[in-house]
C-alpha cells in the first residue's frame, strides 16, 4: 500500500509519462477532459496561506434551444483532524469548526453553491476503538446541535447549501445514535436529514457498536441549486442505494466518506464514477485525510497485533459526471477543497442518449427481488436433467 508521502495518481502519471501517452491514459481513466476553472486569485492566495489544496474543474453540456444551462458549483472538502484525539472534546470540535470555516470562506470566494463535508467531519473517526467514551460525546442533535447551528450560520452568510455529516444523538427516540447527514438550505434553515443506510462490519470498521442502519430511506432535497442526495460512505458499495436516490430524482449525489488505503483505495476511483454512469447523475466522492492515533490500543479480530490507528485516510476526492467523465482527484495527503462546476442539463442529455432509465426493467427486478427476500425462496438455477440427457453410443 502506498504511504502518505505518495501524493496522488495524477502527479505520478504527469511525472513519468510523455505528454502524448499521458493524454491517452487520462482519456481512458477520466473520460472526456474537464475544463480547468479560472479561480479567483484571492481564493488561491487564501488557500495557500491556510495550507490547503484548491482545485477547480468544469463539466460542459450541449447547448439546448428550449432550456438555459443549469449551472451549479459544488465544493468538496477533505481534511485531517487538527488536534490529537486525546484533546478535550470541546476543543477538538472548536478546532474543526475553525478549520472548516476557513475553507468555507474560500469556497464562497469561488462561487460555490453547495458545499459538502466528509463523513462525521466534526470528530475523529473513532468507531474503530469500540469505546463509548469520550467518542459518543461528539454526538449532537441534527436539528439544533452546536455543529448544525454553526453550519446554519455558514449557509446564511455565504448563500450556500451545506451538507453536514455528523454523529447524531436522536433525543426524540431514546437518545440513540445515528450516522447522519444534515442538509441546510442556503437560507440557513435545516431542510432535513438523511441517515447511513448500510453499516460496515469490516476489519476495524466497528460502526454497529455505535449505530445501526438508517431508517429514513432515500430522501432527495430540492434546493435552489438542484436536487441533491447523500449516500454516506459504505453505501457506495451498494448499487441499489445509488439507484433509489436516482429514482427519487437526485441530480447530484454526494458520497461523504472515511475510508483507508489498505481497504478500499483500488475501489475508490471506480464506484462513484460507475454510479454516475448507471444513474444519469453527478456523483461527488469525498474522503478524509491523514492518520488518527487513539490513546488505547484495539484489535481487528484478524490475529494481528493491537494498534492505535485505523489506517491512512487517502483523500483523493473527485466528481464524476453522467457521461462517465470525472475530475482529477485531490491529493492523498493534504487538506483540500475541490470546486467543480456542473451543468445539470447533462443529466437529461445523457439519459436521452443511453436510455438506462427507459431500458432498466425495474418492474422485472421488483418482481424477482420481492420473491428473493422470502424465507422459502428457491434460486432460479437451471440444471442438467439426467433423465432426459441423450445416451452415448
UniProtKB/Swiss-Prot annotation:
The keyword Cytoplasm applies. Its EC number is 3.5.1.6. The modification Phosphoserine is found at residue 378. It comes from the Eukaryota. The active site is at 119 (proton acceptor), 196 (proton donor), 233 (nucleophile). One of its GO terms (biological process) is protein homotetramerization. Keywords: Allosteric enzyme, Cytoplasm, Hydrolase, Phosphoprotein. Homodimer, homotetramer, homooctamer; can also form higher homooligomers. This is Beta-ureidopropionase.
Amino acid at each position: 500500500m502506498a504511504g502518505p508521502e505518495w501524493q496522488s495518481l495524477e502527479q505520478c502519471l504527469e511525472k513519468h509519462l510523455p505528454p502524448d501517452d499521458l493524454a491517452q491514459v487520462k482519456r481512458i481513466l477520466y473520460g472526456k477532459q474537464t475544463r480547468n476553472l479560472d479561480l479567483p486569485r484571492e481564493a488561491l492566495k487564501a488557500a495557500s496561506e491556510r495550507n490547503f489544496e484548491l482545485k477547480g474543474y468544469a463539466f460542459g453540456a450541449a447547448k439546448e434551444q428550449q432550456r438555459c444551462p443549469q449551472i451549479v458549483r459544488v465544493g468538496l472538502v477533505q481534511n485531517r483532524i487538527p488536534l490529537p484525539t486525546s484533546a478535550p472534546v470541546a476543543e477538538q470540535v472548536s478546532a474543526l469548526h475553525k478549520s472548516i470555516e476557513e475553507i468555507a470562506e474560500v469556497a464562497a470566494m469561488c462561487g460555490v453553491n453547495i458545499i459538502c463535508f466528509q463523513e462525521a467531519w466534526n470528530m475523529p473517526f473513532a468507531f474503530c476503538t469500540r469505546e463509548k467514551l469520550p467518542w459518543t460525546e461528539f454526538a449532537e442533535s441534527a436539528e439544533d446541535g452546536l455543529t448544525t447551528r454553526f453550519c446554519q450560520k455558514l449557509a446564511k452568510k455565504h448563500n450556500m447549501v451545506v451538507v453536514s455529516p455528523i454523529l447524531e444523538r436522536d433525543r426524540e427516540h431514546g437518545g440513540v445514535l445515528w450516522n447522519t447527514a444534515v442538509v441546510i438550505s442556503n437560507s440557513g434553515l435545516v431542510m432535513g436529514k438523511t441517515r447511513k443506510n448500510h453499516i460496515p462490519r469490516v476489519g476495524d470498521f466497528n460502526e454497529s457498536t455505535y449505530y445501526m442502519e438508517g431508517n429514513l430511506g432515500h430522501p432527495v432535497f430540492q434546493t435552489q441549486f438542484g436536487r441533491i442526495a447523500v449516500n454516506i460512505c459504505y453505501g457506495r458499495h451498494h448499487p441499489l442505494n445509488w439507484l433509489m436516490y436516482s429514482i427519487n430524482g437526485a441530480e447530484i449525489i454526494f458520497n461523504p466518506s472515511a475510508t483507508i488505503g489498505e481497504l478500499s483505495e483500488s475501489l475508490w476511483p471506480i464506484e462513484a464514477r460507475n454510479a454516475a454512469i448507471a444513474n444519469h447523475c453527478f456523483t461527488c466522492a469525498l474522503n478524509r485525510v491523514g492518520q488518527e492515533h487513539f490513546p488505547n490500543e484495539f484489535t481487528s479480530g484478524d490475529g494481528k497485533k493491537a494498534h492505535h490507528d485505523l489506517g491512512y485516510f487517502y483523500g483523493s476526492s473527485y466528481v464524476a459526471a453522467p457521461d462517465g467523465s470525472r475530475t482529477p482527484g485531490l491529493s492523498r495527503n493534504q487538506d483540500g477543497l475541490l470546486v467543480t462546476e456542473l451543468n445539470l442539463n447533462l443529466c437529461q442529455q445523457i439519459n436521452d442518449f443511453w436510455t438506462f432509465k427507459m431500458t432498466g426493467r425495474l418492474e422485472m427486478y421488483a418482481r424477482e427481488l420481492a420473491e428473493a427476500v422470502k424465507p422459502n425462496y428457491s434460486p432460479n438455477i437451471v440444471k442438467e436433467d439426467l433423465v432426459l440427457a441423450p445416451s452415448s453410443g
